[in-house]
């Protein structure tokens, strides 16, 4: 089955257009001040009209409080909220009840035991996102351009959509699809020429690689 594709950390109309024209199913806006891909709410609001259904907008947040989430939702109107911090199951349940939007919960993976916390979120979220654990000293929970052992996902027994993130690019995405069989591929730094700067050719190349991998 061909995985869906999420392009994350887009900041310009040109990059958004190329991603959508090539078949992106999800566009991710990042609301985290420490990230080179961060957008202000006003910037995101200006870009929002470029994303039309059936493409869905994902608001990526890191331990955001209710006030910030309320502002994002009121102004940017995302279709989905991604929680990429240390949000507890109780926090996720609160956010789901408060805002009523589908939720993606990100988990940082390096080894098999890192999957242990996933079970506590069963039934609370709509998608599980698995990213490589950030290197020591990094201020970014994601978008670091590193991957984890994708074969670990084969042991996951969860009735929930899986999103594979971390270190994906045009060169390795075929292998990632073969090994992990994710429902959704999530790429950010793998289509950048510099941190936070998306490259049109790299975006196009990634989609071409996914197409070839699925056809073979």
Describe the residue ranges of each PLM region.
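Conserved N-terminal beta1-alpha1 strand-loop-helix module at the mouth
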Residues: 1-184, 189-216
